[in-house]
A protein has these predicted regions:
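Short clusters of hydrophobic/aromatic residues that line enzyme substrate/ligand-binding pockets
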Residues: 50-52, 133, 196
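Short secondary-structure boundary/capping elements
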Residues: 43-44, 74, 170
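Ser/Thr/Pro/Gly-rich low-complexity linker/stalk segments immediately outside membranes or between
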Residues: 27-42
Length: 217
């Protein structure tokens, strides 16, 4: 009986030790990510980055995204709904992280469409046709024009602008900033410079709500 009690106590102690170690590890990961983001705050937002929402919003939501990323597509309407539910409170800043093969051409098309005042329309059109644009995680770039037709874009100008060194520089800078911030997957969110404690839309909503409440103090 005594040996059984000792065994149970030892097992309980081992379990508690494991749980404590896991919690400490998770907290350390979050602290390191926050310190990294704070130390590299200038890498979070660039003056050229596409933005949506109130320029003076108390919450700045930075999203590193890949237009060929399925999870990015799933999050896009959810983020817009969250912004609509908090009018004037959230400013969305999009940063490019074209990790899929050929996705840099989608980004170039978005930036070229932006020059014609059609960035958000082009983004939604490409996201809507994402399944037809990418096969086996590789973007079929020759299909881009088909799905941008009908937006009122000058496609000849768009194709020419896609080859612009300025657009190439935007992509290169965003990828460099993603590397600085150790972004390795998409979407990656920062709420007023803070990374999510763990990935998920509920976690994103909670952190945004927390920052909105702080702004009221």
């Amino acid at each position: 009986m005594k040996q059984k009690t000792i065994f149970i106590l030892a097992a309980a102690a081992l379990l508690l030790s494991f749980l404590a170690t896991a919690v400490i590890y998770k907290n350390n990961q979050r602290e390191q990510a926050e310190q990294q983001a704070s130390a590299n705050r200038e890498a979070l937002v660039r003056v050229y980055s596409p933005t949506l929402g109130n320029a003076n919003a108390p919450v700045v939501l930075v999203e590193f995204f890949d237009p060929a990323c399925e999870t990015c597509r799933a999050f896009y309407p959810l983020v817009k709904e969250m912004m609509a539910a908090n009018p004037g409170k959230i400013r969305l800043v999009l940063r490019y992280a074209p990790f899929h093969a050929g996705s840099d051409q989608l980004v170039a098309a978005l930036e070229a469409a932006r020059r014609q005042g059609k960035f958000w329309e082009a983004l939604e059109a490409l996201l809507a046709e994402q399944d037809n644009l990418a096969q086996n995680h590789t973007v079929e770039t020759d299909r881009i024009w088909k799905y941008l037709d009908g937006l009122g874009l000058d496609l000849n100008k768009l194709k020419a602008d896609m080859a612009s060194p300025d657009i190439a520089n935007v992509i290169a800078q965003d990828l460099a900033d993603a590397q600085t911030l150790k972004v390795s997957k998409t979407p990656e969110f920062y709420v007023n410079g803070k990374p999510l404690p763990s990935f998920g839309f509920e976690q994103l909503k909670a952190l945004v709500a927390e920052e909105i409440e702080k702004s009221k103090l």
